[in-house]
Amino acid sequence: MNTHPNIVHDHVGAQHTVPQVAQASANRRAFTSIETLKSNVSQSDALRKFSSPGPASILRNLRLGPLQRIAEVYVPFHLYRVDYDLGREHQARFFAIDAVEGSLDLFEFPAIPQQGELIQLETRNALPVTLNDDASQKLMREKALRLIFQQGFFKLRDANVTTTRIRIDLHRAYWLAFYGNDTARCRVLDATRGRIEGAKASALFESWLSA
């Protein structure tokens, strides 16, 4: 069974409870120091989520094989303060957008994350920042407007929205699940929200895995 050379995996099964380093490779990613939101999903919780029974699980096992391994990975995010006016009421909200492609759902904070909400760690499983500031700000504005409209605030004017980057080191954790011998495709669990993500999240991580 081959594992991706750049991922540190947790193998499924009682005999592999300690995270194992993937097969040695000359191009293994170096450790990097990051600050990340504390995960709300433990390794055992992630295993239960990925292994939950049901028709979809049966079909997936038939198509891909059984769950073999999981890996916790970290995605960099850019944090913005988004200001806008609704009538006479001023609103200020804090949204984070992934700094890889800007394709993941926005994550909203009630306020700027404080030091006690973040942990510092060293990991090989951190995606790089590839989204520049201009592209990040443009995508944030578009996504924030769309989200606000979806929440029923149709009278908001585009010109009333301003976005301000809050420069902090911020990552969020995700669990990836690999089935059978397939290391190119994965399922994704958001370790903050505790939910299984859809196709766009899988595509983001699969692109990183194949790079």
Task: Report residues per predicted region.
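Short, acidic, Ser/Thr-enriched surface-loop or helix-capping motifs
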Residues: 190-191
